[in-house]
C-alpha cells in the first residue's frame, strides 16, 4: 500500500525476467495506465463493466430502492455501450478510437435539453448510432431510459453524474486514458504488478476494485480459452500460476462478485492471499459474505492481533483438547479413616483467546483445512536465497527507480476525424 515494495524488489524481479507494472493510486502519476474499454471484447462486457463501476464507486451499502439502482445502470449501460459501438467501424470492427470512462462524464453533460423542443446532443448521437448500427444494444438501453420523464429522469442523470464526477480530475483521466497494464498477458508472461493504495484517503481506491474485477474476468476467460485449446500455440503447460497477494485488503474496496471469484479461480491456475489486520475488517466490507470468504480460504496464517473478535475466531478454530484430572481425598477420625479418588475428563479450548493473543512475536499459527492447527516460527526475509538482491533504502544499489510515461490530455482524442460532430463538441466543452 505504501508503494515501497516495488522499489525494494523491482530490480530483482526484472533481473529474473519479470515485467514490472505499477498502478499508483497515491500520487496518480508515474504510473501504468488502466482503461477498462481496452478489455471489452463483446457487448456482454458492457454490463460487466457497468456493474463493476457501480459496485466500486458506491459510498454505502444503503443505495436506496432497487428501482433507482436499476435505472442508473440502464443509463450507464447506454452511455458505455454508445462508446463501445461508436468507437468501432461498423463494417470491419476496426478500432476507430479508444474511449475511456472520462468520456462517459462528457456524455452526461450533453444529456439535458437546453430547449425542451430540441433534442439534446446525446439524443442526436444515439439516433445517428442507430442509423449506422441498427438494433445495437446501447440504443435499446437508451430507449428504455427515455421512458423516464421529468424529475425521475433528472434524478437518475444527477446520480450518475455524481458518480462520474471523479473522472473530471486531469490526473484521473490520464490514468484511465490508455492501457499499459496488459492484463491479458499476466497468465502467459512473467509479470509482477504493484498497486499502491492510499491508507488515509480512499477517494480513488475504487479504481483498484475495478482493476481487480476486470482482471479476474479477463484472466478467467484467457485461462479457459487456453485450457480448452482455443489459443493457438498455447497449452496447459504455458499457463502460468498467478498469485494475488492482497495486502491491506480492506483498503482495496469491495470487489464485485468476489465470493464467486474466490471459489472458482483455483482451477484456472490462480490463487488469492488475503491479508487483514482483523476479522471485522472483512465483515465491514463484505457483510454476511465474510464467512463464505473465510471458508473458501484453505489455509489461514495467524501472525498476531489486538482484536478481540479475531482472537475468539481463531480460538474456536483451533478446536478442543481433552484434560484428564484426578483428585484424591482422605478423612481421619479417632477410630478409622477413609480415602477416595475421583477421575474426570474435561474439555477446554486448545488455545483460549488470550493464549492466541500471547503467541510469540516470532511465531505464527497455521490452520490448514482438515488438519490440526500448528504453531511455527515465522520465516525471515533475510533467510531468503535472494535477500541480497532486495533493496533496503533509496541509497541501495538495488533500489528500483522507474519511469512510467504519462499521457497528455490532448492524446485522449485519437482519430478525432472519426468522431461525430456532437461528440467532438462535448470534448471541446
Can you name each region flagged by the protein language model?
Residues 212-213, 220-222, 300, 320, ...:
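Short, charged/polar low-complexity linear motifs in solvent-exposed/disordered segments
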Residues 1-270, 285, 354-375, 390-429:
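P-loop NTPase motor domains
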Residues 11-15, 37-39, 288-292, 316-321, ...:
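Short secondary-structure boundary/capping segments
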Residues 197, 201, 248, 276, ...:
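Short loop or secondary-structure boundary microenvironments that flank
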Residues 83, 96, 313, 331-333, ...:
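Intrinsically disordered, low-complexity N-terminal regions enriched in serine/proline/glycine
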Residues 262-264, 271-365:
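Conserved ATP-driven motor cores of ASCE-family P-loop NTPases powering translocation/secretion/packaging/pilus
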Amino acid at each position: 500500500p505504501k508503494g515501497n515494495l516495488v522499489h525494494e524488489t523491482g530490480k530483482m524481479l526484472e533481473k529474473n525476467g519479470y515485467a514490472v507494472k505499477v498502478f499508483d493510486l497515491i500520487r496518480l502519476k508515474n504510473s501504468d495506465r488502466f482503461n477498462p474499454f481496452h478489455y471489452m471484447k463483446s457487448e456482454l462486457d458492457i454490463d460487466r463493466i457497468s456493474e463493476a463501476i457501480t459496485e466500486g464507486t458506491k459510498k454505502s451499502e444503503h443505495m436506496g430502492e432497487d428501482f433507482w439502482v436499476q435505472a442508473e445502470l440502464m443509463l450507464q449501460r447506454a452511455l458505455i455501450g454508445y462508446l463501445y459501438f461508436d468507437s468501432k467501424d461498423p463494417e470491419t470492427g476496426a478500432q476507430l478510437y479508444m474511449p475511456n470512462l472520462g468520456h462517459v462524464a462528457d456524455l452526461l453533460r450533453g444529456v439535458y435539453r437546453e430547449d425542451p423542443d430540441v433534442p439534446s446532443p446525446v439524443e442526436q448521437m444515439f439516433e445517428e448510432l442507430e442509423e449506422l448500427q441498427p438494433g445495437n444494444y446501447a440504443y435499446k438501453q437508451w430507449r428504455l431510459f427515455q421512458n423516464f420523464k421529468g424529475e425521475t429522469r433528472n434524478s437518475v442523470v444527477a446520480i450518475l453524474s455524481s458518480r462520474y464526477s471523479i473522472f473530471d480530475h486531469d490526473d484521473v483521466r490520464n490514468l484511465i486514458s490508455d492501457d499499459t497494464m496488459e492484463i491479458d498477458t499476466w497468465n502467459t508472461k512473467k509479470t509482477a504488478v504493484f498497486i499502491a493504495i492510499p491508507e488515509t484517503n480512499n477517494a480513488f481506491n475504487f479504481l483498484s476494485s475495478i482493476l481487480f474485477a476486470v482482471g479476474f474476468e479477463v484472466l478467467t476467460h484467457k485461462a479457459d480459452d487456453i485450457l480448452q485449446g482455443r489459443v493457438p500455440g498455447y497449452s496447459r503447460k504455458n499457463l502460468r500460476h498467478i498469485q494475488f497477494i492482497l495486502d491491506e485488503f480492506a483498503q482495496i474496496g469491495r470487489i464485485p462478485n468476489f465470493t464467486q471469484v474466490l471459489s472458482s479461480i483455483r482451477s484456472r491456475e490462480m490463487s488469492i492471499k488475503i491479508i487483514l489486520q482483523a476479522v471485522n475488517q472483512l465483515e465491514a466490507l463484505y457483510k454476511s459474505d465474510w464467512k463464505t470468504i473465510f471458508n473458501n480460504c484453505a489455509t489461514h496464517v495467524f501472525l498476531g492481533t489486538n482484536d478481540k473478535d479475531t482472537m475468539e475466531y481463531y480460538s474456536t478454530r483451533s478446536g478442543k483438547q481433552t484434560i484428564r484430572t484426578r483428585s484424591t481425598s482422605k478423612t481421619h477420625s479417632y477410630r478409622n479413616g477413609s480415602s477416595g479418588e475421583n477421575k474426570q475428563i474435561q474439555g477446554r479450548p486448545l488455545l483460549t483467546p488470550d493464549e492466541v493473543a500471547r503467541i510469540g512475536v516470532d511465531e505464527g499459527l497455521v490452520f490448514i483445512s482438515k488438519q490440526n492447527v500448528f504453531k511455527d516460527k515465522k520465516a525471515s526475509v533475510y533467510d531468503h536465497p535472494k535477500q541480497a538482491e532486495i533493496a533496503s533504502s533509496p541509497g541501495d544499489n538495488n533500489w528500483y527507480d522507474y519511469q512510467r510515461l504519462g499521457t497528455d490530455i490532448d492524446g485522449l482524442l485519437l482519430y478525432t476525424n472519426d468522431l461525430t460532430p456532437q461528440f467532438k463538441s462535448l470534448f471541446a466543452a
